[in-house]
UniProtKB/Swiss-Prot annotation:
Species assigned in the record: Caldanaerobacter subterraneus subsp. tengcongensis (strain DSM 15242 / JCM 11007 / NBRC 100824 / MB4)
Domain of life assignment: Bacteria
Pfam families the record matches: UPF0236 (PF06782)
Annotated protein name in UniProt: UPF0236 protein TTE1650/TTE2708
Family: Belongs to the UPF0236 family.
NCBIfam families found in the cross-reference section: transpos_ISLre2
Length: 492
């Protein structure tokens, strides 16, 4: 039988007990033992990965995946150990004994961004009012029925803002989650909006409002039209690009036009000194709901989006392109009568009745929106409209490309999330859900407890490092170097 030399890493003495390599001490030893053992196991496995790299070869993607799996595992072990240590500290606290009676210990499984963790915590009954709770869960803001921690939910929603529920569910954490879990997280966060902190209302001479709508299929076969309105102060150059200055986006699904514009008017009132504003331009495709804004926004004038103007000119001249230049010349000169005359000529030149109707439709559109066209020649502050590009980027890129269709609820929530993201919103700063934890604040560690716990862990860990066999042997190995670094740098 072939003899092999014992590896000093295979047996590590901790807490006066010996652990075989790879055997978890999580349920058998105290906090310091667990943390130190996990660190030792981590070092061994990194060395093992390095050996595989040298012996078998692997590319950077494989290397990163192996290391991430390892660090996630280390993190899960650390979190479990920390929660159980906190549970022990609470259980031994004199203040706790005065108010809470120990009932039993229960296991808890929780999905985190590192994967699933499982820990034991103590269940208590209040001496004062008879209610039951897990004090360590209350201290860490873990809800009684929580199965997924907030960090995972945030990732689910952040991913879902940009891609499908299915893809989002696969990226949030190592565990497999369902599309329904993603929707539940979105429902929990609700309709979010970035509320800008207003220290002082701004003074601007000109304000711009642009609006458009998207057409989104619903699961019941019908369409919904989420509407986008954004307010800005003009354009400015940044990094060689023209961008909108201080832009703020708003999304509406199912609201009446008057309610939309009352909301926009309130935003302007809250953020700007209205008496200093000389002009407000409302730009869009001329839809009635957009022009409704002229009734609610003081000092406002309509500007027709030139994208839609061009679309109708092209539509009218598709069979007779020679008339295109004539129409544009009349438009650019602000000559309404000349525009009418060119369109009449074009209608006469059309051979098919269908073509005539198409030309008449374009003529009607242009004449009905003439005020929004001639303003380009009359007012130097008019800068046009970029609503079509914005509706595509903010809404269509996510909302119009769902082949299965949206639920009305899901569409509204996602539209709000899209503009929340565009406005620079952070889901970590949002109050999630409406459920109130009646046990919140049931237990808090005192500064004295915290200081004593940290001192004890540091002292105990350093003592254990000093007693580890591999250090006393003195042979220089990877694990030896790590432990010396921990010992003399007092990392733990």
């Amino acid at each position: 039988m072939k003899k092999t030399r014992d590896n000093p890493c295979d047996k590590i003495e901790l807490g006066n007990k010996t652990s075989q390599k790879g055997v978890s001490l999580v349920k058998k030893h105290i906090f310091e033992d667990i943390i130190l053992q996990n660190a030792l196991n981590f070092t061994e496995e990194v060395v093992e990965i390095f050996g595989d790299l040298l012996n078998k070869g692997m590319n950077i993607t494989e290397l990163v995946a192996r290391i991430k799996e390892l660090t996630d595992k280390l993190g899960r072990g650390a979190i479990e150990a920390i929660i159980e240590e906190l549970d022990r500290i609470i259980k031994e606290d004199k203040r706790r004994k005065e108010k809470w009676v120990v009932e039993r210990k229960d296991k808890k499984r929780l999905t985190t961004v590192l994967g699933d963790i499982e820990y034991e915590r103590t269940y208590y009954k209040s001496k004062e009012d008879g209610r039951y709770t897990y004090l360590v869960d209350d201290a860490l803001e873990i809800g009684r029925h929580d199965r997924i921690e907030k960090g995972v939910k945030i990732k689910l929603v952040e991913n879902a803002i940009e891609e499908s529920y299915e893809r989002s569910s696969k990226k949030a954490c190592p565990e497999e989650l369902s599309k329904q879990t993603v929707l539940n997280a979105i429902r929990e966060i609700g309709e979010v909006e970035v509320k800008r902190e207003i220290k002082e209302k701004k003074e601007v001479r000109v304000l711009y409002i642009e609006a458009d709508e998207d057409h989104v299929p619903l699961q019941d076969g019908r369409d919904e039209t989420p509407r986008l309105v954004y307010i800005h102060e003009g354009r400015e150059e940044k990094n060689g690009r023209n961008v909108l200055k201080n832009v703020y986006y708003k999304a509406y699904v199912g609201e009446k036009p008057e309610d939309i514009w009352i909301d926009v008017a309130n935003y302007i009132e809250d953020n700007y000194k209205e008496e200093k504003i000389e002009k407000i331009y409302i730009a869009g495709d001329g839809a009635p709901w957009i022009k409704e804004g002229l009734k609610w926004i003081l000092k406002s004038r309509f500007v027709l989006d030139r994208y839609h103007l061009n679309k109708y000119v092209l539509k009218a001249t598709s069979k007779e392109p020679k008339y295109r230049d004539k129409i544009w010349r009349a438009i650019n000169e602000g000559d309404k009568e000349r525009v009418k005359k060119v369109f009449d000529e074009l209608i006469k030149a059309a051979e098919e009745e269908r073509e005539k109707e198409k030309i008449k439709e374009a003529k009607k559109y242009i004449l009905n929106n003439w005020e929004g066209i001639k303003i380009y020649n009359e007012d130097e502050d008019v800068i046009g409209c970029s609503a079509e590009g914005h509706i595509s980027h903010v809404f269509s890129a996510r909302l119009s490309r769902n082949p299965l269709g949206w639920s009305r609820e899901g569409l509204k929530l996602m539209a709000k999330l899209r503009v929340f993201s565009k406005n620079g919103g952070d889901l970590r700063e949002v109050e999630w859900g409406k459920k109130k934890n009646i046990n919140a604040g049931s237990y808090k560690l005192t500064k004295k407890q915290i200081k004593e716990a940290v001192r004890r862990v540091k002292t105990s860990t350093n003592e254990k490092i000093n007693n580890i066999t591999v250090l006393n042997i003195g042979k220089v190995t990877p694990i030896y170097r790590v432990l010396r670094a921990l010992k003399y740098a007092q990392v733990i």
